[in-house]
Amino acid sequence: MPAAVALVTPDPSATGVPLSVMFDLGMAADSMMLVAWELGIGSVPATVYRQGLARELLGYPEDHHCEFLLSFGYPADPAELTRPLQSGGRRPLDELVHEDRW
């Protein structure tokens, strides 16, 4: 059965809220997604664009903000977890990564 997690923080635009709260939020989301994958559970982040609607549905306080949601679920086909990466569509790494100079 799929599940979702709402990542709610103090409003990052409010006075006194450190910008690091967004970094911390990203780190927490990343950790949840990595642990889920280790357990064979897939995940997808979704940005919340309509704060008013999210607040109404989830009931979090006015002085808080829900930047995004994480959805979790088992893949429909377990073989997808072990299939090797397929080539196609990706640029070679040496076109994207530069060392010392561009």
What is each model feature region?
Residues 68-102:
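C-terminal helix-cap and adjacent tail motif
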Residues 40:
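Structured binding elements
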Residues 33-36:
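Hydrophobic pocket-lining residues that define ligand/cofactor binding sites across diverse proteins
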Residues 9, 47-48, 74:
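Short secondary-structure boundary segments
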